[in-house]
Amino acid sequence: MSRLLWKKVAGAKVASGPVPATARWVASSVLDPVPSDGRPPSQMPSSENGQLRLNPLLIQMLSRGLHEQIFGCGGEMPDEAAVQRSVEHLQKHGLWGQPATPLPDVELRLPRLFGGNLDQHFRLLAQKQSLPYLEAAASLLEAQLPPEPKSWAWAEGWTRYGPEGEAEPVAIPEERALVFDVEVCLAEGTCPTLAVAISPSAWYSWCSRRLVEERYSWTSQLSPADLIPLGGSTSASSSTKQDGQEQLVVGHNVSFDRAHIREQYLIQDSRMRFLDTMSMHMAISGLSSFQRSLWMGAKQGKHKNPAAHKARAEVPEESQWSSESSSWDWMDISSANNLADVHNLYVGGPPLEKEPRELFVKGSMRDIRENFQDLMQYCARDVWATFEVFQQQLPLFLERCPHPVTLAGMLEMGVSYLPVNQNWERYLTEAQNTYEELQREMKKSLMDLANDACQLLSGERYKEDPWLWDLEWDLQEFKQKKAKKVKKPASASKLPIEGAGPFGDPMDQEDPGPPSEEEELQRSVTAHNRLQQLRSTTDLLPKRPQHLPGHPGWYRQLCPRLDDPAWAPGPSLLSLQMRVTPKLMALTWDGFPLHYSDSHGWGYLVPGRRDNLTEPPVSPTVESAAVTCPYRAIESLYRKHCLEQGKQQLEPQEVDLAEEFLLTDNSAMWQTVEELGCLDVEAEAKMENSGLSQPLVLPAACAPKSSQPTYHHGNGPYNDVNIPGCWFFKLPHKDGNNYNVGSPFAKDFLPKMEDGTLQAGPGGASGPRALEINKMISFWRNAHKRISSQMVVWLPRSALPRVVTRHPAFDEEGHYGAILPQVVTAGTITRRAVEPTWLTASNARPDRVGSELKAMVQAPPGYVLVGADVDSQELWIAAVLGDAHFAGMHGCTAFGWMTLQGRKSRGTDLHSKTAATVGISREHAKIFNYGRIYGAGQSFAERLLMQFNHRLTRQEAAEKAQQMYAVTKGLRRYRLSADGEWLVKQLNLPVDRTEDGWVSLQDLRMIRREASRKSRWKKWEVAAERAWTGGTESEMFNKLESIAMSDTPRTPVLGCCISRALEPSVVQGEFITSRVNWVVQSSAVDYLHLMLVAMKWLFEEFAIDGRFCISIHDEVRYLVREEDRYRAALALQITNLLTRCMFAYKLGLNDLPQSVAFFSAVDIDQCLRKEVTMDCKTPSNPTGMERRYGIPQGEALDIYQIIELTKGSLEKRSQPGP
């Protein structure tokens, strides 16, 4: 039934996906368990008890019992030639014969598996989970929908409209399927204002109480009563998973609409699921980030010739075989993500009118009331447009993502849930107060620096200051009217002036004792006379008061005028955004003072230049200093820096990787690749067709010059900045040397502040303290708007389950609620989930205000958070693809072996090997390794090397990158075409071939050159095939590229198609990097979907009370009832085992290494944090989670501990103790 419906909705036969090797399960009926009476092959090495199993490469595999339960009995051993080829490959890379310590076997009886193999098992589970929602979707597609009502009811709550438009109030729309859209008046907060829905039988509208009932003000705190009811009662007694039938809600960016549905905030999960047309569009015809910029440029008419964009980022990747012009057909089969463009792509017709939306964005509630009918029609048109898009999308989606696990996984991903309590509000308050306090302290430090700098005016000392010499030091003279001459009384001229005696007078040296009454009276008279004298001068003041006369110009610009409503004393306008601030703080880069250039942005001055000390500026285009630069002072400053650092000359040294880079999830690594412009120009294709060796191209501005320092290398020198005695170097920009740095306080420079490269100069503590505070507040400054605007709904006691209210830890005065993260379940072309706050949040750091954000997600009493990180997920996926491609054995490639058997302690893991090969830190090597797997080219490595170690020259970075790629990715080799073989024979050309018949790039170019010369420069296609050879990762990249360049790229496990906008038929040889990246990242999404399906099955099968919370890249978290926590942990371990086995099975590897079968640890905790032992101490949480919030450390359990606690069973029993 389910398969027929799937085919019916898809409109095409469901593809079976990649065909694995012969199944090794004994065929069984759907309900039969996997038989387990077979034995491993006799030639397989095993222990005395028959459980320990090693493959021919001596890698420990699943124990015999687990292998039989999952893969069945029997199995073919790889042929001797494949084994020998693998051993020789491992020997070549120094990995064969490395010692390995066997892991204890895992004795575990798995739940009953269905079908004849793992693929059938997952298909049956996913079909069971998604079938009710697929049936609901089919009812929408097949229905003849009613016409839109001509008039909309002005009534609070839901209204149903009959066939003739008659309005009838209803409690909720009792429908199995709805297309739904919510509109919010942003001026009034996050409370929903109105909504429209359509079902196969009727239209519905909803109006909020705040819209219908006019009040002076409403509370800003949301309660369930403010939200839209859509799924029954909100009382805890009736809100269980078993209540009601399955409901499907369809919307465009439906996670926004879900956040305004009342029942979705209940702790117990509901049976309502959501399908997002925006996510389905990304999976069907989504655009990569660079394609989107091209598409938008073409749409706006800014670039009539899209080929002009080839100078940027991704389009100029490796061309597949030649440098022929790019294809732009992909622009016709894709679009941006908004509803209007998506509707135009799939449906066509007149463009959607989006102007009324501005009333919700900028208007007030009164504006919405006055335009109620028009705005309801606008919302209804969006609903109808979404329905039309859905009609076209769903069959396409099921055809291009045919495995039912994909749909079931996306449905589960769409119900993310983050529980919070009163600590959330406390966190917001503490973080904001700490931020404001530090802001005030930083402001005072900066004002002190400005006031101190003014003192340099005395004796013109500023002229010898390495930073302040070029500021505006001109003084504004004090102006006054001419005074009228008045004859002074003689008595006034004879008044004694207090303190006017000569210096050294005894009256200044001795204590005169307490003043007498006469002296007191005399002083009072003197003060009064002086005051009168000052008052008499008021007539001399100019009509328009001067602004701080007697102060330098730069200082006057920092002080508000007296008539300014926001007047405050001193240089109160000073901020980090001002160009004068880095100078006042005396910032240095490696000991060189920072300097700002109008044409090149922020840089620094390197002393030692002599060729421009006497020469005037060459031309008007050359920047020159209007005042003399104190280059001697700069030389002295740098010498002092070198002595303090204990060095006479800079030497290249490794800089530790900032935690921000490591804490950025690996999914963000692809964004880093794109930001750095890592994608190679069509250099390879040009090299194949040319007779020139590959040049090392330096940026024009950084080309060797006649004048440059010998002791310093950097981004420069830029000699058009003519500073006498100094060279100007630009600060390095994360996007490349051609970009200017606008502020040295940007977050990209935080790692340089931490490692001491960028620091405040000498002269007091104000500068270093301001720099330190800037680092501390950087996270909250950038994220507080997103965090503070999170939509939190607090639940009344009646909506809380009894397990919460009866728990000893329940606080009667506390608040319990939830945040629904607005996750786009497929927000990128790789189908990765996207959400701006929670999916990108870093972990807590002791020097970052508010960075304890994730720990504020706290389980309610009686519940815990159970989750785990998938160890090296993408590395393993890439490795197992390479292993299957090379010899069909786990660990048969060097890359696969290091992933499985490598140990950090022995330096044999992937990251340690790369670090040792290139001479970089292991942390840096980790970034490079992920970048390569994501498809980044050698240019990426060069730029990232220079970003991590700015002291490297471009030549040194290029050499390191070339060495790294030669060892890891290998060298490109080519197989000659028939024409190529004929030319070699006819021209009698000497060609050096490998054992497999591959030729080098040099030989390929030689054949092309000679053939062209002998045939009057005819162009010959002499290469039929190309591959990577000789590297630790060559076979893996060959497999990834073979998938990426196939006619219809599909993920190897679930068979999901790449976006139509990246199919080879429309992009030809372009966007190779995006396509290679897609293979790994999209396979990782398959991994997540398999996990979600398996966990849902085990929770339902064994009555584990829990629900999915969130998935952050390679980790998953579930909210689980406390008494079920250990069973949920075991379910997670079994899920990981079956998911990895599914990958191996689909690739023809009917086995799995023991080292990757289970999570290294499953976390059981009361809050969301990276490690259960992290106390999350930060400036806003200085005492930690336990002392401040009462949250103790959690548990991290491995598979052996979990089996001991649960007796290896998922069945419910009396709860074991910890």
From Swiss-Prot:
A motif (Pol B) lies at residues 922-937. Its main location: mitochondrion. One of its GO terms (cellular component) is gamma DNA polymerase complex. Residues 31-50, 484-524 are annotated as: Disordered. One of its GO terms (molecular function) is exonuclease activity. A 2'-deoxyribonucleoside 5'-triphosphate binds at residues 869-870, 872, 874, 922, 926, 930, 1114. A motif (Exo II) lies at residues 250-258. This is DNA polymerase subunit gamma-1. It comes from Mus musculus.
